[in-house]
C-alpha cells in the first residue's frame, strides 16, 4: 500500500508541475534558409531579359508573377546602393511582382519567416508576406540599420502540411522597376512556450525567437501586434506604432543567455505581456537594461508598468555592452497584470545619426514577494 501511495503522490506532483518541466526542449524540425532562399541559384541566361526574369518557373525553387528582377548587390545606376550582405544576388519585386514557394510544414504548428528586405527607390515601398488565410503588409523603413537593409520576422500558424509562402509588391509606381529588394528568406518552427520555474513571465529571457542568420545580422524587426496576431517572439505583444528589434548574442552584446530585444523607437517601440496574478498579492519585478555594443550611446531609460504601477530604470550607455538590473515591488489589483516596457528617449548610434537604436531589455522576471 505504501508503494501505491508513493507512486500516486509522484504522479500527482508530475501533473501539477508538468508546465515547469526541466526536460530538454526538442530541436525545431525547421530552422534554416528556404531552398534557394538566398537566390544564389540563378535562372538560365535564356530566361533573362536584362535583369527581368522571364517565365513563371525560371527562378529555381520559386514561382514568379509580374515584374521580378534578379539583381546583384553593390552600387547601381542612378546612385543607388543595393545592400546584399549575405551573398551576391537578390530579387527585386517590381510593379505587382510576386515570388512564392511551397514549403513542407506540420499542420497546427507555428512558424516564423525571417527575411531581409529594403526599398530600392526614394518613394514609399511596402512588401506583403502571406500564407493561405494569413497575410501582413509591411512598410519598408530604412531607419533601423546602418547599411539600409533591414531584416523582418513574420509568424503564422500552419493550417496544412504544405503552405505556399508568398512575397508580393502591392505597389504600382511610374517606374515599374522600383520595388522592394528581397535578399534572403528563412523559416523556423516556434516551439511551444514553457514557464521557467519561479518566473511568472513566459519567455522572459527572449530565448525563443525567429531564425537569426549566422553570417550577418543587424537584428530582426518584430512588427506591431496591430499588424500580426501571431508573434515571432512568443509570449510577447508588440503594442506600438514601431517595431522592436530582436538581437542575438552572436552579433550583439546581450545581458543574459542568447537573445534580447532592443527598444529602437523611443515611446513608439513598446513590448508587453499579460501574466497571471492574484489580486492583493505583492510581487517582485526585475529586468535588465543595457546596450547592444553597437554604438548606441547616451542617457537611457526604460519605463515599465506592472498594471497601473510605473517604474523607471535609467542607464548611462557608452556603447560598450554594459548593463544593469532593477528590482521593483508591486501589488496586483486583478488576476491578470499587464507588463509593459518602452524606451523613454530616442537614440541614434554614435557614428551614424541617421539610424535609430535604443536600450536592450532582457531577463524579465516576476516572482511572489516574500
Curated annotation (Swiss-Prot):
Effect of inactivating the gene: Increased hypocotyls growth in seedlings under both light and dark conditions, with longest epidermal cells.
Pfam families hit by this protein: DUF642 (PF04862)
Annotated SUPFAM superfamilies: Galactose-binding domain-like
Record bears the keyword Metal-binding: no
Reported tissue expression: Expressed in primary and lateral roots, stigmatic papillae and hypocotyls.
PANTHER family with a match to the protein in the record: DUF642 DOMAIN-CONTAINING PROTEIN (PTHR31265:SF23), OS02G0527500 PROTEIN-RELATED (PTHR31265)
Full protein name: Protein TEEBE
Natural source organism: Arabidopsis thaliana
The encoding gene: TEB
Amino acid at each position: 500500500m505504501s508503494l501505491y501511495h508513493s507512486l500516486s503522490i509522484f504522479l500527482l506532483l508530475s501533473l501539477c508541475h508538468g508546465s515547469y518541466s526541466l526536460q530538454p526542449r526538442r530541436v525545431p524540425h525547421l530552422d534554416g534558409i528556404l531552398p534557394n532562399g538566398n537566390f544564389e541559384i540563378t535562372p538560365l541566361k535564356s530566361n533573362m531579359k536584362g535583369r527581368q526574369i522571364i517565365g513563371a518557373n525560371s527562378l529555381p525553387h520559386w514561382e514568379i508573377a509580374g515584374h521580378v528582377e534578379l539583381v546583384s548587390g553593390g552600387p547601381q545606376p542612378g546612385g543607388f546602393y543595393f545592400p546584399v550582405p549575405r551573398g551576391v544576388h537578390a530579387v527585386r519585386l517590381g510593379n505587382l511582382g510576386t515570388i512564392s514557394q511551397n514549403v513542407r510544414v506540420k499542420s497546427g504548428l507555428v512558424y516564423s519567416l525571417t527575411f531581409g528586405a529594403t526599398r530600392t527607390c526614394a518613394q514609399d515601398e511596402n512588401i506583403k508576406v502571406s500564407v493561405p488565410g494569413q497575410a501582413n503588409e509591411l512598410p519598408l523603413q530604412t531607419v533601423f540599420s546602418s547599411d539600409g537593409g533591414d531584416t523582418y520576422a513574420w509568424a503564422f500558424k500552419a493550417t496544412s502540411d504544405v503552405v505556399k509562402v508568398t512575397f508580393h509588391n502591392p505597389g504600382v509606381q511610374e517606374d515599374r522597376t522600383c520595388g522592394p529588394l528581397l535578399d534572403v528568406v528563412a523559416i523556423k518552427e516556434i516551439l511551444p512556450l514553457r514557464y521557467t520555474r519561479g518566473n511568472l513571465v513566459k519567455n522572459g529571457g527572449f530565448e525563443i525567437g525567429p531564425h537569426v542568420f549566422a553570417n550577418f545580422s543587424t537584428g530582426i524587426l518584430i512588427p506591431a501586434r496591430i499588424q500580426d496576431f501571431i508573434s515571432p517572439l512568443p509570449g510577447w505583444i508588440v503594442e506600438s506604432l514601431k517595431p522592436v528589434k530582436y538581437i542575438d548574442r552572436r552579433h550583439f552584446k546581450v545581458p543574459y543567455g542568447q537573445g534580447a530585444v532592443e527598444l529602437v523607437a523611443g515611446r513608439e517601440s513598446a513590448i508587453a505581456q499579460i501574466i497571471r496574478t492574484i489580486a492583493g498579492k505583492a510581487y517582485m519585478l526585475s529586468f535588465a537594461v543595457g546596450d547592444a555594443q553597437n554604438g548606441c550611446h547616451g542617457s537611457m531609460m526604460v519605463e515599465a508598468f506592472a498594471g497601473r504601477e510605473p517604474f523607471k530604470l535609467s542607464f548611462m550607455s557608452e556603447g560598450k555592452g554594459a548593463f544593469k538590473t532593477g528590482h521593483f515591488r508591486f501589488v496586483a489589483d486583478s488576476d491578470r497584470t499587464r507588463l509593459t516596457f518602452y524606451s523613454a528617449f530616442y537614440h541614434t548610434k554614435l557614428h551614424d545619426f541617421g539610424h535609430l537604436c535604443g536600450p536592450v531589455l532582457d531577463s524579465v522576471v516576476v516572482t511572489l514577494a516574500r
